[in-house]
Swiss-Prot record:
HAMAP family: IolG
Reactions listed under catalytic activity: myo-inositol + NAD(+) = scyllo-inosose + NADH + H(+); 1D-chiro-inositol + NAD(+) = scyllo-inosine + NADH + H(+)
Pathway stated in the Swiss-Prot or TrEMBL entry: Polyol metabolism; myo-inositol degradation into acetyl-CoA; acetyl-CoA from myo-inositol: step 1/7
Protein name as it appears in the record: Inositol 2-dehydrogenase/D-chiro-inositol 3-dehydrogenase
Disulfide-bonded cysteines: none
The protein's Enzyme Commission number: 1.1.1.18, 1.1.1.369
Role this protein plays: Involved in the oxidation of myo-inositol (MI) and D-chiro-inositol (DCI) to 2-keto-myo-inositol (2KMI or 2-inosose) and 1-keto-D-chiro-inositol (1KDCI), respectively.
GO biological process: inositol catabolic process
Enzyme class, spelled out: oxidoreductase
Assembly notes: Homotetramer.
One Gene Ontology term of the molecular function aspect: nucleotide binding
Length: 350
């Protein structure tokens, strides 16, 4: 491998996750220099830098950051609506790009990104599906591939958030929340989806808008017949709760919970439940960025989740939204074969 050098990174979008990645890239990941930060809100980029005791060039227009010669790699953590245009601009500039999920708002936009990346002749983009790097999911993947529980038959999951603002509507529950399970399930069982249905149980009283459907039940069937159930509840109140059980012919795999110190006090035995994703997947985010930077710092293509993974997730999410709008009607799914551009680039990078 070529000798690594300090990679100059620019971050577009400095909200909650953007600020978290700013800290990660400057304090946790080696061989990185964050040289520029951009946010459309005046003064927000500088405020984030000041809060973390950092210095960098600040911009309000992402075009200025993308075209800055002192930026080699673009990290997109802007609002979902802006992902497409930022990624397209970064690829046009010929720069390695990391884009938080979702890659874009729909499958068509994802395919445009794929076409742009292909024109560059090699992989330049990684999508932030960080669960691929979570040690517990990696272990589950290996055990499934090794046939430890026989062939997978069913999956039972939940994705609960403590709360979300009123503007976090039914579509965002799919595009921003359920998208994680849509992606990771496809990766875990390595089986394309055949159809999807989304149902709405009784609405929680913690939603004031009658048009918002929370919770939701997402049901997916794969080509080989695996049945997947995912409960999505973004206002569960009690905490951030992730569950993944894979039921096979010979046994069951259970995703472990994050270890917490147990307390014996006042005639009670209890353990805490996390309240958000930040602590739950902190190590996955760290490993994800170390891997991404390790490759691009040596001018190598990234090997993590690709634009094609983003496309598969988007096609499925589009169908999920249609099912939700049609009161749970089954939506058939049919994916083209993975382009050789992606399978071959992954083999080369390995």
């Amino acid at each position: 491998m070529a000798e690594a050098h300090v990679t100059k990174v620019g971050i577009v979008g400095i909200g909650f996750i953007g600020s978290d990645h700013l800290h990660r890239l400057t304090k946790t990941v080696a061989n990185v220099d964050v040289t520029a930060v951009c946010d459309i809100v005046p003064g927000k980029a500088q405020k984030a830098l000041d809060q973390q005791g950092l210095t960098a060039t600040t911009y309000e227009d992402y075009h200025d950051l993308v075209n800055d010669p002192n930026v080699e790699v673009v990290v997109c953590t802007a609002n979902n609506e802006a992902h497409y245009e930022i990624v397209m601009a970064a690829l046009k500039a010929g720069k390695f790009t990391f884009c938080e999920k979702p890659l874009a708002l729909d499958a068509k936009q994802c395919m445009d990104i794929i076409d742009s990346e292909k024109k560059l002749g090699r992989r330049m983009l990684q999508v932030g599906f960080m669960r691929h790097y979570a040690p517990e999911y990696v272990q589950m993947k290996k055990m499934i591939d090794d046939g430890v529980i026989g062939k997978p038959l069913m999956m039972d999951q939940r994705h609960y958030n403590q709360t979300q603002p009123e503007e976090y509507d039914s579509s965002r529950s799919i595009i921003e929340t359920a998208i994680h399970e849509i992606d990771i399930d496809h990766w875990l069982v390595n089986d394309d989806y055949a159809n999807i249905r989304v149902f709405s149980p009784k609405q929680t009283r913690h939603v004031q808008n009658a048009k918002i459907q929370d919770p939701q039940i997402v049901m997916i069937e794969t080509k080989s017949g695996i049945n997947i159930i995912n409960e999505v509840f973004v206002r569960c109140q009690y905490g951030y709760d992730i569950k993944c059980d894979v039921i096979g012919e010979e046994g069951v795999l259970e995703l472990p919970t994050v270890p917490q110190v147990a307390t014996r006090l006042n005639a009670q035995y209890s353990t805490a439940i996390l309240t958000d994703w930040k602590a739950r997947f902190e190590s996955a985010y760290d490993i994800e960025f170390r891997d991404f930077i390790n490759h691009v710092s040596q001018n190598e293509s990234p090997v993590g989740p690709s634009a094609w993974d983003g496309y598969i997730a988007a096609v499925t999410a589009d169908a999920a939204l249609k099912s939700l709008a049609e009161d749970g009607a089954k939506q058939d799914l049919d994916f083209p074969s993975t382009p050789a551009f992606y399978t071959e680039s992954e083999k080369v990078s390995e």
